[in-house]
Amino acid sequence: IKVILDGVYSHTGSNSLYFDRNRTFGGNGAFCTRQSPYYNWYTFYEWPANYHSWWNFDTLPTVNKMHPDFIRYIITDEDSVVAHWMKLGADGFRLDVADELPDEFIQLLRQRIKGINPDALLLGEVWEDASTKIAYDRRRSYFTAGELDSVMNYPFRTAIIDYVRGHDGGKALK
């Protein structure tokens, strides 16, 4: 059995330790104090209540993925999130909304994961054809730059389901 963890690095929950909108974790989150060690992870338009969120869901504040503090915490520190779980035996990560992560972030993540375990899997959630994906006016290099080992193949999944249900007369599989 292999253990693949779901890495959500584009946003956090509004009630996470890092944001703590409901003050569940003692009020040290970015929503509670500008002195929070996590404050720079987020973009506030008018602190605290007006902030950038994933697809405008206020329960999912977006993270500044390339902020040095976030990079250290997630990837590069000795006991970063990635290193911690890899050392405990995780066999890799599935990247939630990989198309919303900068290529540079994915490259750093891959270097760290493969540095700990060269056989670890880095799998991306990409809803469209990942080989031709353009996100934020930029062609993604998931495969051409070797960023990801694989992706969730939703177009193929849809074709199989449509075929089994008899919805496309087999066109998707030709």
Language model segments and positions:
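Core domains of carbohydrate- and sulfate-ester-processing enzymes
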Residues: 17-64, 157-174
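Active-site cleft segment of glycoside hydrolase catalytic domains centered on the general acid/base Glu
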Residues: 51-71, 98, 102-110
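N-terminal structural segment of carbohydrate-active enzymes
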Residues: 1-2, 12, 17-20, 72, ...
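A residue-identity detector for tryptophan
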Residues: 41, 47, 54-55, 70, ...
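A structural motif corresponding to the C-terminal end of an alpha-helix
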Residues: 1-3, 84-91
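Short, acidic/polar
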Residues: 67-87
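Glycine-rich, aromatic-flanked loop segments that form ligand/cofactor-binding clefts
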Residues: 1-12, 32-44, 123
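Active-site-proximal helices and loops of the catalytic beta/alpha 8
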Residues: 10-11, 16-26, 81-83, 91-174
